[in-house]
Regions:
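Bacterial Sec-dependent N-terminal signal peptides
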Residues: 1-40, 248
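Start-of-domain marker
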Residues: 37-92, 98
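Residues that define the transmembrane beta-barrel architecture of outer-membrane proteins
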Residues: 43-47, 80-84, 119-123, 153-161, ...
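Residues on the lipid-exposed face of transmembrane beta-strands in outer-membrane beta-barrel proteins
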Residues: 51-55, 86-90, 125-129, 145, ...
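Short loop/turn motifs that connect adjacent beta-strands in outer-membrane beta-barrel proteins
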Residues: 56-62, 91-96, 132-139, 169-179, ...
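Transmembrane beta-strands of outer-membrane beta-barrel proteins
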Residues: 62-66, 84, 97-101, 139-143, ...
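Transmembrane beta-strands of outer-membrane beta-barrel pores
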Residues: 68-74, 92, 103-109, 131, ...
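Outer-membrane beta-barrel transmembrane domain signature
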Residues: 138, 142-222
Length: 248
């Protein structure tokens, strides 16, 4: 009977210690797990809200174009970038090619709770080449060079190539009332690797892949909502994008 009592007590003590160990592990694990679940990192989906405009002067091949983009690390409130850009355009008589000389100002915000920002001044040159693929598909090739003055870095230049595609769904071309699909892929290449103070960047800067559903609202407005995946040399990040396109 004493032997049975000893065994019973031993089992109770062992079980109690084991249960205590599990409880301690749970107490330690739960707070850290909760923090990990709640923490925001650069892989969380961001959101870009954008307005694009283009203006052709009357009876002229000259015009203006520009955009305002409010980019967030999250869905809203954590500023990634505020981009203001505009340029003077010249379009060939057949409207197949548009050349642009422009300027951009970019305010970049730090990720997370920090309110610190940095500024960039940018001059760019662009060639946009348009052509069709069959009756419905419209393609645009965009080649852009950028001269960049980024705060805290040496002068830098960058090359970009983007391929854009629009496909009308309920018509043969995009006009008021038309729903359409919009796609693009754009690659960015750094032309300098040294950016000052012993810091270097890779030639590959980033790639953006985008898909969206668009609707021609009429009165020279189009609305697009979609998703863009951006892969850089260090971060892969998804972005929800909502854009309003205005031509006048």
């Amino acid at each position: 009977m004493c032997h049975g009592f000893f065994v019973h007590n031993h089992l109770v003590m062992f079980t109690s210690k084991k249960l205590l160990a599990y409880l301690l592990l749970l107490v330690v694990w739960l707070p850290t797990h909760s923090v990990a679940q709640q923490a925001i990192d650069e892989d969380d989906t961001g959101a870009w809200y954008m307005y694009f405009f283009s203006k052709r002067f009357t009876d002229s091949q000259w015009g203006l174009q520009g955009d305002v983009q409010y980019r967030n690390w999250d869905l809203g409130g954590d500023l990634e970038q505020l981009l203001l850009r505009g340029g003077l355009t010249w379009t060939t008589a057949n409207k197949a090619v548009t050349l642009t000389q422009g300027y951009g100002n970019i305010t970049s915000g730090a990720f997370g709770d920090s309110d610190s920002t940095s500024n960039e001044h940018r001059i760019y040159q662009e060639a946009l080449i348009r052509h069709g693929l069959g009756e419905r598909v419209k393609l645009r090739h965009r080649l852009r060079t950028e001269q960049r003055w980024v705060e805290g870095q040496d002068f830098r230049t960058r090359f970009r190539y983007g391929l854009f595609m629009d496909i009308p769904l309920n018509d043969t071309k995009i006009r008021p009332g038309t729903w359409y699909l919009a796609f693009y892929n754009e690659v960015f290449l750094n032309l300098e690797k040294n950016i000052g103070n012993g810091r270097r960047v890779k030639t590959f800067d980033r790639n953006r892949l985008y898909a969206a559903l668009g609707h021609d609202l009429g009165r020279n407005f189009r609305l697009q909502g979609g998703y863009m995946h951006q892969a850089t040399s260090s971060v892969d990040k998804g972005q929800i994008q909502l854009s309003l396109h205005h031509s006048f």
